[in-house]
Amino acid sequence: MAGFGLPNFGQLTEAFRKAQQIQQDAQKLQEELDAMEIEGNSEDGRASIWLSGNQQPLRVRLDPSLLSEGQEATEAATLAALQSAYERSTGTMKERMEELTGGLNLNLPGMGG
């Protein structure tokens, strides 16, 4: 440590370098997550929803046989597919963030840290 309890210049420079690298990697990760298409399905597979790695809705597919079962069945299957897609998408995001930060335990909001 340098005077006044401050780290030496080399340590400070290294910390800034690491911060810049994490920022660049985070931007790249953001682009990768945006490009992902993560599928979630209802238990019977007749409803599917795709989200990006950032939980942005991309598309929905409903089997015509599901539609003939009425509104309640269609809504339940659609919700199940959405929950599945959301869980997979947030899980993917969390894994990728942990890879990016190298286990720094940043306690990011919404990331279960």
Swiss-Prot record:
Keyword annotations of the record: Cytoplasm, DNA-binding
Family under the similarity heading: Belongs to the YbaB/EbfC family.
MF terms in GO: DNA binding
Oligomer and partners: Homodimer.
Organism: Synechococcus sp. (strain CC9311)
Gene3D superfamilies, per database record: Nucleoid-associated protein YbaB-like domain
Principal location listed in the UniProt entry: cytoplasm
Presence of the UniProt keyword Transcription in the record: no
Cross-referenced InterPro entries: YbaB-like_sf, YbaB/EbfC
The UniProt record lists the keyword DNA damage: no
Pfam families, alphabetized: YbaB_DNA_bd
Function: Binds to DNA and alters its conformation. May be involved in regulation of gene expression, nucleoid organization and DNA protection.
Protein name per Swiss-Prot or TrEMBL: Nucleoid-associated protein sync_0026
Places the protein is found: Cytoplasm, Nucleoid
GO CC list: bacterial nucleoid; cytosol
